[in-house]
Amino acid sequence: MKPAGPRKRAVDPLAHLVLTRYMEAHFEALLVTGYSADTVRARRISIRRFIVWCEERGIAQPADVTRAVLERYQRHLFYYRKPNGAPLTLGSQHGALAPLKTWFKWLARENHILYNPASELDLPKLPKHLPRAILSVQEVEAILAEADPATPYGLRDRAMLELLYSTGIRRMEVAGLALYDVDATRRLAFVRDGKGAKDRVVPVGVRALAWLDRYLLEARPQLIVAEREALFVTDYGEPVSPEYVASRVKRYMEFAGIQKPGATHLLRHAMATHMLEAGADVRVLQALLGHAQLNTTEIYTHVSIEHLRAIHDATHPARLQREDVLAADATDAARQALADALDRDEG
């Protein structure tokens, strides 16, 4: 048997195109200025899709791309249907077009084209979706209680779950925490290179710190096999990954019998919603969650339906009048008949 030779690198079928060369130059500039490889990877998918569309229509040079061309592409995305017949969501259309605006802005700034054809291109308006599910306080406590602190990995998981719920940090952020990023004395955690490559400081609750302290003293020394800076390590002593964090949360959700979609982000949503219900200002939540725009945080002002219903029942004049009617001096049968009639009227 012949020894296996070196693996051949796949040839990029778009490499010979002029548009591709300008795309790669753009991405190199983004990396130099501090954009993450993940951001570049996501934008490459969108711009390559546009380049393929251009090649099919004989559009070869950046200067050939006009506003009319971009609007044609926008209509193409709007009418495009996936293999299952479903259209692209507005979010997907926005995600496909936004990198093009950035790319052509760069091309114009670097004098590769005379003007920016995307400057007046209107992007689809992104809908503001409510989180699909919100955990109640009782459900969060049930999830936390499933981690068994009698075992090293269970104690690690309890500390990790408590930290997620206490701070609302993302799974990639908890995976990126180092030992020196938690200041127990000042009750703070330093989130480095969070979403958007931004650092921030978040407070950590007393209960979460107590579990972290137990983990560091009792569990982590049993899990590590070599010196590691990572705060949380796997059963084999390696730094946890974002996917590992999510899998642990999902595991304890299943143990607690909670079937709601999501994992780590559910704890983030729960933290924001529960704090808002308790009176936290939305701008405080914006800082805690690391949202660049306030309107991203304001979605949480709409999510607590049960809380809104309770307040409505307790304070709305019509509801109070109904209770007065039902409490009036009447027979039990008459009161029940009146209540049934009111319920039918409300329906």
UniProtKB/Swiss-Prot annotation:
Domain of life: Bacteria
One term of GO molecular function: DNA binding
Cited Pfam families: Phage_int_SAM_4 (PF13495), Phage_integrase (PF00589)
GO cellular component: cytoplasm
Purpose of the protein: Site-specific tyrosine recombinase, which acts by catalyzing the cutting and rejoining of the recombining DNA molecules.
Family: Belongs to the 'phage' integrase family.
Protein name per the record: Tyrosine recombinase XerC 2
Gene: xerC2
